[in-house]
Curated annotation (Swiss-Prot):
Keyword check for DNA damage: no
Enzyme Commission number: 2.1.1.-
Superkingdom, taxonomy of origin: Bacteria
Family of this protein: Belongs to the class IV-like SAM-binding methyltransferase superfamily. RNA methyltransferase TrmH family.
Span list, region Disordered: 1-70
Protein name, as recorded: Uncharacterized tRNA/rRNA methyltransferase MMAR_5079
Gene Ontology BP, a term: methylation
Native organism: Mycobacterium marinum (strain ATCC BAA-535 / M)
Compositional bias per record (Basic residues), positions renumbered to this chain: 49-62
Top EC class for this record: transferase
């Protein structure tokens, strides 16, 4: 091997002896020394293997629907780590100002054997497309969706069941906000269709403020069929639509309920609407015609929670 002076017969030319190597002394890594195993090459942002992996992810793959996601922000990251969400790497920006959340995140990641990598903030910006990462990001595998039957069974075990189903909701921020509202008002989970729907992406994780780590989300191959199955098991299917014929004031929230939320633009699809036992609306004052889907869902969930407290 060239330059190996220990090899028999090796001769080093005069003047080629290397001088003393000068490095950083480990200053950049000292803050995270002993905090966790070194990530593999494909997880290091500037490593050629990572660049190849990223390029490969951008290519369309036959049958592939979900990719590894990056959860951003101190609250969502900490919630994921507290909930034991499977994670592949924790990235921390160099020189970031630490607080209790960041310190706990690093500690939990180390205890769980999650690789921790300190990177320049500019690298973190590029990794997250300049989203508001607050100096920390957690790489997680695709979300593990629950089965609709399992979601319902768990809800029925702690009656009265309160579930939310989404129809024509394509914005992951709406999904994340609704997941957060379901958790806040004592709901048991969210049901989404497998096609033409927002999924639990990094954007949804962040909008949910980490609630997606503890609130199950199920995927149905056919939303209408899943709702009919739930109805057969004693769950009242209540649609939420601006054109609903029942005012929220007249809604009886004491029974096991699944609230089906339609999009602000399209509302409920025809088949889903026909599956509903009733369709409620939120009365509006003034010129405002409709509410954002996540806001409307929060209003209905708050009303049901109020009724169940009294």
């Amino acid at each position: 091997m060239a330059g190996n002076s220990q090899r028999r017969g090796a001769i080093r030319k005069s003047g080629t002896k290397k001088g003393t190597s000068v490095g950083s002394g480990g200053q950049r890594r000292r803050g995270l020394e002993g905090r966790g195993p070194t990530p593999p090459a494909h997880m290091r942002p500037n490593h050629p293997a990572a660049k190849r992996a990223k390029a490969q992810q951008r290519r369309p793959a036959r049958g592939r629907t979900d990719e590894t996601e990056t959860v951003l922000g101190r609250n969502p990251v900490l919630e994921c780590l507290r909930a034991g969400v499977p994670s592949t790497a924790l990235y921390v920006a160099l020189g970031v100002e630490a607080d209790e959340r960041l310190t706990e995140s690093v500690s939990r990641a180390a205890d769980s054997g999650i690789p921790i990598l300190e990177v320049p903030r500019t690298d973190l910006d590029r990794m997250t497309a300049n989203h508001l990462h607050q100096g920390i990001a957690l790489q997680v595998p695709p979300y593990n969706y629950a089965h609709p039957d399992d979601l319902l069974a768990a809800a029925l075990d702690t009656p009265p069941a309160l579930l939310v189903a989404l129809d024509n909701i394509s914005d992951p921020r709406n999904l994340g906000a609704i997941v957060r509202s379901v958790a806040a008002f004592g709901g048991h989970g969210v049901l989404i269709p497998q096609r033409r729907s927002a999924s639990v992406t990094a954007v949804a994780w962040r909008t949910s403020a980490g609630a997606a780590a503890r609130m199950p989300v199920a995927r149905a191959t056919n939303l209408t069929r899943a709702l009919k199955d739930w109805a057969d098991r004693g769950v009242r299917v209540v649609g939420l639509d601006a054109g609903g014929d029942t005012a929220i004031d007249d809604l009886d929230g004491s029974d096991p309920i699944v609230v089906v939320v339609g999009s602000e633009g399209k509302g409920l699809s025809r088949l889903v609407r026909q599956t509903c036992d009733e369709v409620v609306s939120v009365p509006m004052a003034g010129p405002t015609e409709s509410l954002n889907a996540s806001v409307a869902a929060g209003v209905v969930l708050a009303e049901i929670a109020r009724q169940r407290r009294t």
